[in-house]
Amino acid sequence: MRFLVLSVACALCGCLPEPAYPDVPALTFVAFEPTASGGRTLVVEFTDGDGDVGLDSGDTLGVFCPTCAHHYNLRCEYEELREGFWTPIELDPATGAIPFYYRVPRAVPTGSSPAQHGTLSVDMPAWYLSGPYDTLRFRVTLWDRSLNVSNEVLTAAAVKP
């Protein structure tokens, strides 16, 4: 099972001007660090002007249904370095490969501004994708509840465990 830890640091202070961010979420890559278990921890920062990042556990109907494209709102698309070129590798659950997709929980902004600025920390399990190529990275994208899609960030390259 994949574990997702969301820590949100809201910079909403009464003495400071309220932050103004676009309503479309924006990501900034922070880290892609190895863990003792052989996996990696992905850390990205995000901003969102209208404060609608994250899904409630009950968000499983309509566009968030389990078989719908937006059931997972954080997607980490797997790539391998092959012959000097980054190559997207489709991970199909029907063949036993599990995509690196996550449901970021909702964090309701506090204060008078709906704007959000926070950090997402994702514990990614060790991956055992067979093949002759040993270097990987992920393309990371976030969707908010309004289905606005963030910019895409790339993790640092890493050697397979």
Q: What does each model-identified segment do?
A:
Residues M1-S7:
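Sec-dependent signal peptide recognition
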